[in-house]
Amino acid sequence: MIKRLVDIGAVKFGAFKLSSGLESPFYVDLRSVLGEPELFQWVIERYEAVLSGLEFDVIIGVATGGIPYASVLGYRLKKPMGYVRDEAKGYGTGRQIEGADVAGKRAAVVDDVLTTGKSVLNAIRAVRASGGEVAGVVVFLDRGQCGAEAVKREAGVYVYSVYKMRELLEELRPHIGEERYRSVLDYLSQWRC
């Protein structure tokens, strides 16, 4: 299934500018997985395996990449689900967290990809501001660019990942060629967390 991530363009190699502003020789967009039912199920099962080690009451998806995964996980695990907007709405109820109430509950925060940790830190702040506690953050891919360390340092919350980019890269190595493999490995080596 790992190779399917490349086949469908969920993992791409080239020159990319990330939302964090960083330049990268690879790009991971797990939204592509949503259109591939078997791969989507495989990804969900990997999330479930990681979540099985956490004690939590509610699942909170990070907008927008974490929302579909959090939705399915909430359904499958029979846990209330909600999601965190980037910022509170300027209309209606003005809420930043939609869906499940987190007050007095332990939340598992779910996102697809972690780079700098900025989006996850925003979600953690929102959960706490709404009276909840964060049991942990679960991502499919930690790009290995110090995001997990930033979350731990700034919020005291541990990030659990299905894959770290170096692990994913090792599994993809036979499918992407040595030159791409080395290029990404060299890029990742600049981050010392």
Curated annotation (Swiss-Prot):
Pathway(s) per entry: Pyrimidine metabolism; UMP biosynthesis via de novo pathway; UMP from orotate: step 1/2
Query: Which enzyme type, at the first EC level?
Result: transferase
Which cofactors?
A: Mg(2+)
Give binding positions for 5-phospho-alpha-D-ribose 1-diphosphate: 85, 89, 111-119
Iron-sulfur is among the record's keywords: no
Catalyzed reactions per annotation: orotidine 5'-phosphate + diphosphate = orotate + 5-phospho-alpha-D-ribose 1-diphosphate
Q: Name one Pfam family in it.
A: Pribosyltran
Annotated EC = 2.4.2.10
Keyword Protein transport (UniProt) = no
Which residues hold orotate? 115, 143
Q: Which GO terms describe its biological process?
A: 'de novo' UMP biosynthetic process; pyrimidine nucleobase biosynthetic process; UMP biosynthetic process
Listed under subunit, the entry gives:
Homodimer.
Q: Which NCBIfam families match?
A: pyrE (TIGR00336)
Protein name from the UniProt record: Orotate phosphoribosyltransferase
User: What is the taxonomic lineage of the source species?
Assistant: Archaea, Thermoproteota, Thermoprotei, Thermoproteales, Thermoproteaceae
In the UniProt record, the gene name given for this protein reads pyrE
